[in-house]
Amino acid sequence: MELNEFVEKFAEQFDDTDPSEIKADTRFRDLDEWSSLVGLSVIAMVDEEFDVLLKGEDMRQANTPEELYNIIKSKM
């Protein structure tokens, strides 16, 4: 999966945020809708799409979808 595809799938985890607002360099924690529940949805999506198990620490290390994508790629 390429970065753009990942960003689209990442953006789909937000119910009330327009997906076009989320880019590879968006600081997702700054989004009003960001919560631990969205974080869990992202972890589940990554497990399903990439077969990679993210930990809470991985989520804390990433500030943007691109940083998270790079963490996932390093675990593949």
Which residue stretches match the model-derived regions?
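Phosphopantetheine-dependent thiolation modules in NRPS/PKS and related acyl-activating systems
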Residues: M1-W34, V38-I43, E48-M76
